[in-house]
Amino acid sequence: MRLIPLSTAEQVGKWAARHIVNRINAFKPTADRPFVLGLPTGGTPLTAYKALVEMHKAGEVSFKHVVTFNMDEYVGLPKEHPESYHSFMHRNFFDHVDIPAENINLLNGNAPDIDAECRQYEEKIRSYGKIHLFMGGVGNDGHIAFNEPASSLASRTRIKTLTHDTRVANSRFFDGDVNQVPKYALTVGVGTLLDAEEVMILVLGHQKAQALQAAVEGNVNHMWTISCLQLHPKAVVVCDEPSTMELKVKTLKYFNELEAENIKGL
């Protein structure tokens, strides 16, 4: 696992965006051989999306031959709702870049057959071979996507019941009213994430410090879903300074020295 320790949330977003752009451009995608990118929602990736849009407008990257798969979606929330992940992605990213509509894949939380929707999502991912890079965030309790504590580390795309803590955390997007936050969501599984060629998780804020410590220094444990990254051959964790508060000094020193060339100048 790589740990990229930076100072601010803005630096995390810019580093992540640059990494994505470098991967896409090195891949040299075509219509017949697209780059497959996994994407998250929420507050954490907003600076990364802003930076990606800016780099696209500057001519540094095209998303014309990029196929995207989003991590999750609420169940029962109309896709036109301002807090649906469909709306979030179009508002913050898709509407500002040159990605073709047919290359965008979002789970349908209003599908008449939820099980079939999840199965077809997995099949579509497999039809492209694999996701080349999956970007994600992490919850205070260590969940990635909506794989809440005690999720199977071999799980696939499915419906999940959201914990009360997750709904409280997400209520900031629903006028602070937890009762407006859906109780269920569709989410890619931990196994789905681990199948990606590379996984990049962004960690911001002191409230995520315990989750980061569990990911980097703890044991692989289904109660801390983020610890699954230890099983991945190419995992990258990009974090700001407040989120590192629970890490041992020697751990942080080790990664600062290891990644010195990759973080200088930020």
UniProtKB/Swiss-Prot annotation:
The protein's organism comes out as: Salmonella typhimurium (strain LT2 / SGSC1412 / ATCC 700720)
Site annotated as Part of the allosteric site: where? 151, 158, 160-161, 254
TM stretches of this protein = none
* Record keywords, A-Z: Allosteric enzyme, Carbohydrate metabolism, Hydrolase
Mind telling me what this protein is named? Glucosamine-6-phosphate deaminase
Please give the activity regulation comment for this entry: Allosterically activated by N-acetylglucosamine 6-phosphate (GlcNAc6P).
- Pathway named in the protein's UniProt entry: Amino-sugar metabolism; N-acetylneuraminate degradation; D-fructose 6-phosphate from N-acetylneuraminate: step 5/5
> What is an example of a GO molecular function annotated in this UniProt entry?
glucosamine-6-phosphate deaminase activity
Q: How does it assemble?
A: Homohexamer.
For this chain, the family text in UniProt reads: Belongs to the glucosamine/galactosamine-6-phosphate isomerase family. NagB subfamily.
EC number(s) from the headed UniProt entry: 3.5.99.6
Gene Ontology terms: cellular component: cytoplasm
Name the catalysed reactions.
Answer: alpha-D-glucosamine 6-phosphate + H2O = beta-D-fructose 6-phosphate + NH4(+)
Active site at which residues? Answer: 72 (proton acceptor), 141 (for ring-opening step), 143 (proton acceptor), 148 (for ring-opening step)
Superkingdom of the organism of origin: Bacteria
Q: Which GO terms describe its biological process?
A: carbohydrate metabolic process; glucosamine catabolic process; N-acetylglucosamine catabolic process; N-acetylneuraminate catabolic process
Q: Which Pfam families match?
A: Glucosamine_iso
State the function annotated in the UniProt record: Catalyzes the reversible isomerization-deamination of glucosamine 6-phosphate (GlcN6P) to form fructose 6-phosphate (Fru6P) and ammonium ion.
